[in-house]
């Protein structure tokens, strides 16, 4: 047993104990790998920015399960899934500089073909993808704006010179016209053909002569006999009911001595008949019940409606006590104050 005793048990062991999960486990305070965070500086200008290796980000699509196309990037914390960049690399995009809306497209004294080619290069869809050529596009826009100002000022001066140069010509033409007036152009009257009808000729005033005596309808020119003129709503002659020349005389209409029956005013009614009424309860109808409403029912409203004090004793009142004559306890009638008082609609 002594020979089996290991003398090396008292010495320090060369084995190093490792924590569960490995030496890089966060449980035992290992240092985290320092990875730079992608912090955006939103105040920085990207007009003259340099090229970026990654594509234009598009964070509109949400979730990693969506399809990602060229230049798309997932939301924060997710891995970029771009198979095109992984297989073929970054795609080459064409340069699309911003469109200069202030530059005039009218050429003044320049080569038309060169201007057209320059306009083709500068005429884009108005978008800039942030790729190469941003500095040149910005500088070209600034230079083109200054050229536009120069061209506009030059065009104004050209137009002003043209307007001033055209002034003396107009004066000379006016003086020339006053000295030598133009000869009038003779107006030819069209002659109608020989086979034309009278209706084809131009209109002219024609005079009407005397009417023959055998014409009984017309006595004079443009005058018709009064006997032939009728009016249905004004004639009152029984023989010629629609004649205007044989009308009866005006009827002798006199004013009536008294007032018309419909204008006789009734006597003033008494105030008791003009009481206001309630269409629900029928109060104010004087007990006649006109219109099928409930007739007026007089109610005595003196006294306290809760305790019943002050009401007059009637045939339906049972609130009086009956005292016994034998000297015992008085018998109290159970018909006491109704619940809700005497003004309740239940009683």
Curated annotation (Swiss-Prot):
Residues 1-14, 146-164 have a biased composition (Polar residues). Residues 1-33, 127-193, 303-347 are annotated as: Disordered. One of its GO terms (cellular component) is nucleus. Keywords: Cytoplasm, Cytoskeleton, Microtubule, Nucleus, Phosphoprotein. Its main location: nucleus. Belongs to the MAP Jupiter family. This is Microtubule-associated protein Jupiter. It holds the Pfam family JUPITER. InterPro entries: JUPITER. It is found in: Nucleus; Cytoplasm; Cytoplasm, Cytoskeleton; Cytoplasm, Cytoskeleton, Spindle. Signal peptide: none annotated. The modification Phosphoserine is found at residues 24, 105, 134, 145. Residues 181-193 have a biased composition (Pro residues). GO terms for biological process: positive regulation of microtubule polymerization. One of its GO terms (molecular function) is structural constituent of cytoskeleton. Residues 132-145 have a biased composition (Low complexity). Binds to all microtubule populations. The modification Phosphothreonine is found at residues 35, 96.
